[in-house]
Regions:
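Long, non-catalytic architectural segments outside compact domain cores
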Residues: 19, 53-63, 93-96, 101
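Acidic (E/D-rich), amphipathic helical modules within compact regulatory domains
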Residues: 48-78
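Alpha-helical bundle segments that constitute or directly flank the non-heme di-iron/ferroxidase center
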Residues: 17-45, 107-131
Length: 158
C-alpha cells in the first residue's frame, strides 16, 4: 500500500510540477507580449497622461517577469520562455499596420485593450487549471487582475 501511495505522489507531484512550469512559461510569454507591444507604442505617444499610464503598465509587466523568474527557479534550472523573434516581428508589424492611418490615442488604446483582453483570456484559462501550487496560482491571479485593472484605465482614452 505504501508503494502505491509513493507512486501516486510521485506521478501526481510530477504533473503538478510540469503544470507549474507550463503556467509560468505562459505567464512570462504573456508579460513579454505586453512589454514588446508597449515598447512599440510608447514611441508614438506624446500625451503625458497616456504615456504615464503605459509606462506604469510596462513596469508592472517587468515586475511580474521578475517574480516569474524567481518562482520558476524553484521548479527548473532553465529560463522561462519568452516571446520568439517571429512573434516580436509580427507584433511590431501589426501595430505599424494598424496605426499607419490612425495613430491617435483612441486607436492605440483600442489596440492595447484588445491585446490585454487576449492576456486576460489566457490568464483565466490558466486559472481554471486546478493543478498548480498556491504561489503559481497567486501569480496567475495577480497577472490577470493587473490586466483587468489596466483595461479599465485604458477605456478612458478610447
Amino acid at each position: 500500500m505504501n508503494n502505491l501511495i509513493f507512486i501516486w505522489n510521485t506521478i501526481y507531484g510530477g504533473i503538478v510540477m510540469n503544470n507549474n512550469i507550463n503556467i509560468l512559461d505562459e505567464l512570462n510569454k504573456g508579460c513579454y507580449m505586453g512589454i514588446d507591444a508597449l515598447d512599440i507604442v510608447l514611441k508614438k505617444i506624446e500625451d503625458p497622461d497616456f504615456k504615464e499610464l503605459l509606462e506604469d503598465q510596462h513596469e508592472e509587466y517587468v515586475e511580474l517577469t521578475n517574480r516569474i523568474d524567481e518562482l520558476y527557479r524553484t521548479y527548473s534550472d532553465k529560463e522561462p520562455h519568452e516571446t520568439s523573434a517571429m512573434l516580436k516581428a509580427m507584433t511590431w508589424y501589426g501595430i505599424q499596420k494598424d496605426t499607419i492611418l490612425d495613430d491617435s490615442i483612441s486607436k492605440i488604446a483600442d489596440l492595447l485593450i484588445n491585446g490585454t483582453n487576449m492576456g486576460i483570456i489566457e490568464g483565466r484559462k490558466l486559472l481554471n487549471n486546478k493543478k498548480m501550487d498556491k504561489k503559481v496560482h497567486k501569480l496567475c491571479c495577480d497577472y490577470t487582475k493587473m490586466q483587468e485593472n489596466y483595461i479599465e484605465k485604458l477605456k478612458k482614452f478610447l
